[in-house]
Every structure is written in structure tokens, then in C-alpha cells.
Amino acid sequence: MGDSRNTGTISNLSSALRQVNIGSGQDQKNINYEFSNGLNNNVNDNGNHNLVNTNEDNVNKDGSINTNMMSRQVPIQHTHGSQLLQQERMNEQQFNPMEYSRISKFFQNQPMEGYTLFSHRSAPNGFKVSIVLSELGLQYNTIFLDFNLGEHRAPEFVSVNPNARVPALIDHGLENLAIWESGAILLHLVNKFYKETGNPLLWSDDLADQAQINAWLFFQTSGHAPMIGQALHFRYFHTQKIESAVERYTEEVRRVYGVIEMALAERREALIMELDTDNAAAYSAGTTPLSQSRFFDYPVWLVGDKLTIADLSFVPWNNVVDRIGINIKVEFPEVYKWTKHMMRRPAVIKALRGE
């Protein structure tokens, strides 16, 4: 597939990830997907950067992973930090209000129903929202903002998200309600879906489970994503090479994954002991390892016995962690299996492909 880049500018240095073309590592080819330049989008047709580039043939027609297909490596563009800062200042001075016309036209003629997602082709948090929209089967369109044109600073968009970042969502069925921050958006979607259908899909009707879902969701948005973002920034984009910062944030990402790994391992053990009753005594005695159980690769989730937004919120960021030198398949096998199960879901595949 084509790969359109404009490596000369970056308008949000605080999120270095947005400027990185991140390819999949050889060991993680099973769980990396392409956020393609060809994403289906009726509103936007510009060619911004891809977060992950992987051959679409990795996805079989039945939605499973083709483990024999090698991922297409895309080199990271190393641009000196001072040049990026200088270019950002130039961008700030050169924006023309006419460049906002595409955004202005949308706000003058908004749909009557469904959702509009404002995202960016290299924004993991934006794809986090599209995954949940897709899983819930909701009608939505995506506008991929062009940061080089300053569309995220268009007055109409700032009225939706005063932080001038993505994602932001407009719920046209609620009088064009605007929601920003990915965690808040996910909670709005599942709560509204539950209220309207009576089905707690990706959510729970149990208050205790809801509290645990919230805890993991906030852990992802406040710990998991920022630490990966900082590790990428200091590894590839900071004006000076500060090894202590690279090491600090990389190790913090490992610590975060250790928390998730332990939780999933506990869920795995509980599931095996519950379902594999014939061998439970041997597992308890330690004479037979849990890895011998036929349920060792069975999907387990962070909360309860079903997939929720707590799990799905991690998916896009798990796709890029190999670029900071962490191989989750080797270091965190439960995280790897968990991610692979989610990446095989048809709705997730559709969301990441933009279908």
C-alpha cells in the first residue's frame, strides 16, 4: 500500500508518537496492524502519517492472524528536535483561516444522527475510540485532522475540545453533544448503549465490576499510554540524547506491563482451576505446569469473564511498544496472548482498517 509522508513538520511535539511511522517488530508480527493511508473516511482524504504499517494480507478472511506473513518494516524518521521546534514555530505563524474551511463546512452541516470522531492517522487514542464504536456496531464517520494545516486549532474544533487534541467525539443523537478525552468517550459510549438497549456490552451491570473497569481504564489513560509516549519521545524526538530519560520511561513501561501481566496470569490460573477440574489437583501440587492445560491459550480478560473497554483501551498502544525495545511476546506472554485475541476480532480489524 502507498505510504504518504510529510516529514518536514510536526505540530504537536508533546505527542511524539504522532510523527512516528512505527512498523511492527518481527517477533510481534501477529499483533501489529496497519492504520492505513487508505482508511475509509467519507469526510477526509488527506495523506497523513501511519501509526503502524503492516501488510493487510496478515488478516485472513475469517479475521484470524496470518502468522506466516511478515510485517512490512517502516523506518522511523529521525528528525533533529531543534528543527522540529523551529518548524512548529513557523507553523504557528503561517496558519491561514481558509485552511480551516473543511472543518467549518462540517460544523455548518452536521449529521442528524450517529457519531463523528475527530482523530489523526497516527493517534492511538483515536483508534481506541473507533474500536469501541465498531464493537458496539454504532454508525460513525471519522475526520482525520491534518495537524500540519493546524486543523486542530480551528475555532470550531476548539469549541468541541478546548485542549485542541484528538480524539473528540460528537454525539449527534444528543443534540451534537461533544465529548473529549478518550476515556470519557469510551465511558459515554458504553453507558449510553447500556441505557438504550439494556445490554451491558463491553461494560457491566454490576457496580463492583464497573468500578474495576474504571480502574483499569484510568490506569491505561494515565499510566500506560503516557509512559509509552514519553519513552518514544526521549528515544526519537528529544533535542538531546538523554539516556537516563530513555531508560527511566522504558523501565516504567515495563513496570506497567508487569502489573497487567500479573493480573492476567491470576485470571488464567483461576480459569484453568475452574474449567480443567480433572487436573486441578496436579496443578495445585505443582506436579503439572499450567502450560499443559488445554485452557492455557483460552482468552482471559481484565474484569469478569468477558471483553470490556478496560481491555480494548490497551490495543492501539500495545501495537507500538516494540519500538521502545520491549518485546511483549517474550517478556509478557499473557499480555501478548490477550492482545492477540483482541486483534483477531472482526470489529477491531474493521476499526483499524477504517472499513
Swiss-Prot record:
Residue ranges of every copy of the GST N-terminal domain listed in the record: 113-197
Residue ranges annotated for the GST C-terminal domain, each copy included: 206-355
Biological process (GO), any one: protein urmylation
Keyword set, alphabetical order: Nitrate assimilation
Gene Ontology terms for molecular function: glutathione peroxidase activity; phosphoprotein binding; transcription corepressor activity
GO cellular component: cytoplasm
InterPro entries: Glutathione-S-Trfase_C-like, Glutathione-S-Trfase_C_sf, Glutathione_S-Trfase, Glutathione_S-Trfase_N, GST_C, Thioredoxin-like_sf, Ure2
CDD domains xrefs: GST_C_Ure2p (cd10293), GST_N_Ure2p_like (cd03048)
Family that this chain belongs to: Belongs to the GST superfamily.
Assembly, per entry: Homodimer.
Primary role: Plays an important role in the cellular response to the nitrogen source. URE2 gene plays a major part in the repression of GLN1 and GDH2 genes by glutamine, and is required for the inactivation of glutamine synthetase. URE2 gene product may catalytically inactivate GLN3 in response to an increase in the intracellular concentration of glutamine.
Name of the protein described by the UniProt record: Protein URE2
Native source species: Candida glabrata (strain ATCC 2001 / BCRC 20586 / JCM 3761 / NBRC 0622 / NRRL Y-65 / CBS 138)
Name of the gene encoding the protein in the UniProt record: URE2
